Amino acid sequence: KECTGVLLTVDATYGAIKEAENKGCNLIISHHPIIFTPRKSFLTKDYKCDVIASAYVSGTAIYAAHTNIDGLHDNMAVRTLKAIGAKNVTTLFDNGFGAQGDVDMKFSEIKEKVKKLLCDDTIFTVGDENKKIKKIAMINGAGGDDECFSRAREVGADLYISGEFKHHILLEAKETNYALMSVGHYASEMCFNDVLNDILKCHFDTIKIVKYYEGNPFNG
């Protein structure tokens, strides 16, 4: 079946499927897979099955690019740190995940730059916002776990940014006066659309590409 256009989105939702129909795109490339755990049946009446059924009825294929995109050398975290002015940006892990970069800014200045970049005021911080930051580490999405937090400290980052954090990580950061910034899972991965757009344009210069932004699931 010939591809009539590609819609890029963080999540393949009802809204994304409808937008793909309206814009004449019969392929959706999302970052998050609809199905994370194996299923024996798609006949169950639940949200995930309904979304898949909606795509099927509309003739829309869905492809999820998740871990392979997170591990790119020019991944979402790398792009985010470069966009806020970090220098010497490299990946945080040897396998390509996350990013680290050098800065010379106050914590509060970085916060304002991130808010402007992500167009989202719902950013939460831990630590003294007057603190001078020399090195940032970042992992988009759910990077606020023990392994990622430990890696950020290991490379000498004095600010770690992610989409969401485990409570005990937030508590440890507060108790040790370590700077954290939680920007929201969705907001931290919005640049997925730009990453995929650039990849597709390199290989298919005439393909129609539509970027779809569902928005943060949280109110306010």
Regions found by a protein language model. Give the residues of each.
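Active-site catalytic microenvironments in core metabolic enzymes, especially phosphate/sugar-handling
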Residues: 1-220
